[in-house]
């Protein structure tokens, strides 16, 4: 006789009216054991409840059509209302939406992991979504778009890393009822109809994710949630980040000159650039927070009617690198250091001088050295302005 399909195990469990097992992450002897149990349950076709930063969610393995079907019926979800797909990272999302627009990539980098679901075109022929069962594709993308999310909770992210394929994820409530924000609510609502609950206490926000439709370079909020539309539109801005060593002379001068050149090109004031969707900043690989610019740099900028006096240095951090659309370095060694630490930023990290020459460090030198440095920066930036406003 053949083996019983693993996905049938949970169906028999339901027939025996087995209550779901609740695993408390906060009091677990080894959280990894909880994660491995969840992975096994999902691989066998079970429905598992997970905490997220928004509300608790019900998840099934996306390749398991039977599990997806049971999830739909458990929720009482209307036909044609799509389920979301959880992936482990913004980079992973590109496997499912290879044609992701620059705006969508920008939002993915800046919002994930986090409480935003991006609704994107899922019809690309190279998408891994094409490998899912037809019934699953109908459930997650009935109109050709797919809602992707990277939840900001370590438990579900670790499960995604260990599981073969993404998760189909939906809020842990029946259709039309309030979302569950605790494990007890889930147990009371669904009882033995789900197989496992991962409990990590109340959810951080207690509110659903914001659902955003991104088409080309336009966005539309489909469902209000944790992240406001105003914040989302701010996150849509193009970010240019200049990097040097201490963030006290070269990179802040580049930031200030770049603001001036962009404002001239766009016929606005430097203060209005953010309203035009452009954010310009700077940081230093070895910078201390709150440092003042060198007096020579302030003086040289003042000669061009630019004010650098209020600048405060900041160290280069992972969020700055990941959020930036352009990371512009003063030297080749700065670029190498960034790529050694954050290799995923390679396509967005560039040397200021397109001819490959470094911008020499004027620190400790006379004012005239700072003037030459400013001239070099201005000349190099002239080749970048068209790219920034394209």
Predicted feature residues:
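Extreme N-terminal basic, low-complexity initiation segments
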Residues: 2-12
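Active-site-adjacent structural elements in enzyme catalytic cores
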Residues: 10-243
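Short clusters of hydrophobic/aromatic residues that line enzyme substrate/ligand-binding pockets
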Residues: 23, 148, 211, 308, ...
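Phosphate-binding/catalytic loops
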Residues: 134, 138, 167, 172-174, ...
């Amino acid at each position: 006789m053949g083996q019983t399909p693993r996905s049938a195990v949970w169906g028999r469990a339901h027939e025996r009216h087995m209550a779901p097992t609740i695993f408390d992450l906060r009091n677990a002897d080894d959280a990894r054991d909880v994660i491995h149990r969840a992975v096994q349950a999902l691989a066998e076709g079970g429905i598992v409840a997970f905490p997220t930063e928004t509300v608790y969610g019900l998840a099934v393995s996306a390749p398991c059509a039977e599990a997806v079907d049971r999830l739909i019926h458990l929720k009482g979800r209307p036909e044609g209302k799509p389920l979301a797909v959880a992936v482990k990272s913004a980079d992973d999302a590109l496997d499912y939406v290879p044609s992701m627009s620059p705006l969508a990539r920008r939002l993915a980098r800046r919002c994930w992991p986090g409480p935003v679901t991006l609704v994107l075109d899922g019809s690309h022929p190279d998408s891994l979504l094409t490998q899912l069962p037809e019934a699953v594709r109908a459930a997650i993308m009935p109109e050709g778009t797919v809602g992707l999310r990277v939840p900001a909770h370590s438990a579900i992210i670790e499960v995604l890393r260990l599981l073969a394929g993404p998760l189909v994820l939906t809020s842990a409530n029946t259709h039309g009822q309030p979302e569950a924000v605790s494990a007890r609510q889930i147990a009371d609502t669904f009882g033995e109809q789900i197989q496992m609950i991962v409990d990590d206490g109340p959810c951080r926000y207690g509110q659903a994710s914001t659902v955003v439709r991104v088409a080309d370079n336009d966005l539309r909020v489909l469902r209000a949630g944790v992240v406001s539309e105003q914040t989302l539109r701010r996150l849509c801005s193009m970010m240019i980040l200049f990097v040097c060593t201490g963030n006290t002379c070269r990179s802040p001068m580049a930031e200030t000159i770049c603001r001036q050149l962009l404002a001239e090109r766009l016929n606005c004031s430097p203060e209005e650039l953010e309203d035009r969707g452009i954010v310009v900043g700077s940081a230093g690989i070895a910078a201390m927070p709150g440092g003042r610019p060198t007096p020579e740099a302030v003086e040289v900028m003042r000669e061009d009617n630019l004010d650098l006096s209020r600048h405060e240095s900041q160290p280069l951090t992972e969020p700055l690198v990941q959020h930036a659309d352009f990371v512009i370095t003063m030297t080749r060694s700065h670029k190498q250091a960034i790529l050694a630490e954050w290799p995923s930023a390679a396509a967005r990290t560039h040397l200021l001088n397109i001819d490959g020459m470094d911008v020499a460090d004027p620190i400790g030198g006379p004012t005239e050295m700072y003037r030459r440095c400013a001239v070099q920066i201005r000349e190099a930036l002239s080749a970048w302005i068209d790219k920034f406003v394209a």
